[in-house]
Amino acid sequence: MSTRASVHNHPVHPMLIVFPIGLWVFSIVCYAIFLATTAPVWRTVSLYAMGGGVIGAILAAVPGTIDFLTLGPSRVLTIAMTHMISNTVALTIFTISLVLAIFWEGHTLVPFILSLFGLLAMGIGGWLGGALVYEHGVGVSHVDVHAETLVEQHV
C-alpha cells in the first residue's frame, strides 16, 4: 500500500513526524529542568520547542491526512483512524499546554502535567503509526514489502 503523499516514492509523513516527536519530548525535559531549577531560560527553551512541535505536527498532519483519505476501505482503516485521533489529541493537548504556559505564568505545574498527557497520546499515536507501517505495510511500496522474500529466493 503505497502513499500518494510522497516525494520520489518516499512517504512525506514519516519524514516530518520526527520534528514534533523530538521537539515535544525536548520541551518536556526542558520544562522539568525549569521546574527543578527555576532558571527562566529553561522555560523559554521549553516554550519554543513546544511551539515548534505544534507547527511540526500541523505540517506532518497534512500528508498524514492525505494518506488517510487515500486508504480507502481496508482492514487498517480503524488503526489509521485511531492513530489520527490520538495524534490530534496530542496536538490539542500540547497547544493548550503552550497557551497556558505563555499566558498563565503563575501556574507552572499545570502545563507540565498536560504535556505529560500529550506525551502519552503521542506515544499511543506513534505506536499505532508504527503498526500501520511495520505490521500492515501502509506507505510501503509493493516491491519493498516482498524484498526480504526476493532476497531469500536468490540466495
Regions found by a protein language model. Name each.
Residues M1-V155:
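Polytopic transmembrane helical bundles with strong interfacial aromatic enrichment
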